[in-house]
Amino acid sequence: MALEALTDLKKVRNIGIMAHIDAGKTTTTERILFYTGINRKVGETHDGASTMDWMEQEKERGITITSAATTCFWNDNQINLIDTPGHVDFTVEVERSLRVLDGAVAVFDAKEGVEPQSEQVWRQADKYDVPRLCFVNKMDKLGADFYHTVQTIIDRLGAKPLVMELPIGAEDDFEGVVDLLQMKALMWPGVVAAGTEPTIEEIPADLQEKAEEYREKLIEAVAESDEELMERYFAGEEITVDEIKKQIRHLTINGEAYPVFCGTAYKNKGIQPILDAIIDYLPNPMDVGSIKGFDPKDREIERNRKPSRDEPFSALAFKVAVHPFFGKLTYVRVYSGSVETGDKIINSTKNKPERVGKLFQMHSNKEQPVDRASAGHIYAFIGLKDTSTGDTLSDSANPVVLEDMDFPDPVIEVAIEPKTKSDQEKLGTAIQKLAEEDPTFTVKLDEETGQTVIGGMGELHLDVLVDRMKREFKVEANVGAPQVAYRETIKKPVEKLEYTHKKQTGGSGQFARVIIALEPLVPEEGSEETYEFIDEVTGGRIPKEYIPSVDQGIQDAMQYGYLAGFPLVNIKATLLDGAYHEVDSSEMAFKLAGSMALKEAVAKAKPVLLEPMMAVEIITPEEYMGEVIGDVNSRRGSVSSMEDRSGAKVVKARVPLSQMFGYVGDLRSKTQGRANYSMIFDSYAEVPQNVAEEIIAERTGK
């Protein structure tokens, strides 16, 4: 079938594959592409030949960093597939992929079950209400345990799994699955080539009883969610397979339950049932319905868009990448209407006109040109100059802004110095392009040292970015040791602080008076907001046009905190009153007054230092448990829980990021290489007084 967008949206699925690093996500994706006829040769991650991993570093490191989008077909249905990274440093990639997906397949390792990263990605999918299927992969692995993995889905994710298949055998003897709907065995005995169809056989005698028990559980779980089915079930009437499937689809799309399948992608067993399930149970764009948006000029006015070609054009840019030949590629999910090459549209987030140069449907990093981009599909646009991740594109005559995406602040920074003058220029270009692609990559100039400081979500994240500067932009640079991204905040409210900015030199002077109040801001659950500004000025004592300048002045001053020059967060500023002068007042005067008022108020508000705390999970053999816990305590960490997992001990702790540099080597030497760990950013916490004094002294030289 030609790679063109299907007009019948009921036959379209926009899905992603999400998982913990090493759960076999990229291999699962590769198999899907092979089975749907896109790939003629199967790429393996450990050979560095995987199709979806198309950046040099991904091939080298055997991990997926960027989410490439691919279109493929299965039984006359079109699947637009987005590959997402499983490494914690790349959560922003996962977040922006989930934002534009209609459904996802969560891949779990049959031995490990739900791991910390799977849990984090699952919660991100909850945030965007993404319906999911579960695929328990690596059933051929030593220690694989399907039933344990299903239990971890219940215990750790609080989710309701619907077991659709039972494994036949495990580890080296994994040969197939029992299809609990059809009550047949799908067998792939021995070593099978990619694409091998299963033989359909009777259920092995030793599994018959278990299969009947699990089928009964499945039908009961499905029936209890529908009154009519429940009555028929208790009356002993037969419920047809089609009726069960229809209700499973309903439960899955509503996020009430999650169908669970199993197999081994690497050994080519269990892939076809997952493809069938994507079509049977995950939603099409019509099921998802209208997308919420608002009027760019007035956010109070709602503007919703239906997934139809007849509606005005609206789309969300969810990824920007630099292509070696075409330059800037913008990945876009089209929600309504359509657009053709050459059309003029508007970036309604930034209120800037854009022109569509070329349009492609992507197969990993190979492009298939198309003339039109239409509702319900994912495309790569070329020629968009001002569009970055999270921006809305819409019809110029009917602008709309779709919901924004939230991105976390960086937790780790490094100073980077170009080696030569020409590297200085190249570094500027590289930083600008990489920042366009990745909203969690930040750049700032350290005013004290004059160095360029780049920030990101972890050591691997920054390694990859620096590596890309060298490879793609030929920048030679010295990179400093990683620094923790500390923050400052206040603990005490300041009810009233008055500041007057006044300058009188020949001609017109400068005048602005502001009275502000400050208080600590407690961010709402799940919100990335760390600042709030409230205007309580009455009677025109400060003209309306100057109030945004006060706000801007306060925000500018928050970039450099009082204690050690770290950014200020979690502050609520209220502009109470002020005064102006007909001639001498200006936006600049009020901006300066806002900045100085904040600085003086913070000094009185009991400022403190904050540091990023990491949620660390360590898996260790029992005999090293004491060493591991002692080490966590010596790093100012606190152990929150301990549990058993497949013969090992799991220690969960909160540890300051500053104490985790070089931890991997220390852990290996303490446990003879038998323990491993993972960590994700948890929250910011106050630094103990004695440690804070050291940090401030080192930073300020006092």
Swiss-Prot record:
- Where is it chiefly localized? cytoplasm
Q: Give the superkingdom in one word.
A: Bacteria
PROSITE patterns on file: G_TR_1, G_TR_2
Tell me the ranges covered by the tr-type G domain, including all copies.
Answer: 10-286
Q: Which family does it belong to?
A: Belongs to the TRAFAC class translation factor GTPase superfamily. Classic translation factor GTPase family. EF-G/EF-2 subfamily.
The protein's job, in short, is:
Catalyzes the GTP-dependent ribosomal translocation step during translation elongation. During this step, the ribosome changes from the pre-translocational (PRE) to the post-translocational (POST) state as the newly formed A-site-bound peptidyl-tRNA and P-site-bound deacylated tRNA move to the P and E sites, respectively. Catalyzes the coordinated movement of the two tRNA molecules, the mRNA and conformational changes in the ribosome.
Q: What is this protein called?
A: Elongation factor G
Annotated organism of origin: Corynebacterium urealyticum (strain ATCC 43042 / DSM 7109)
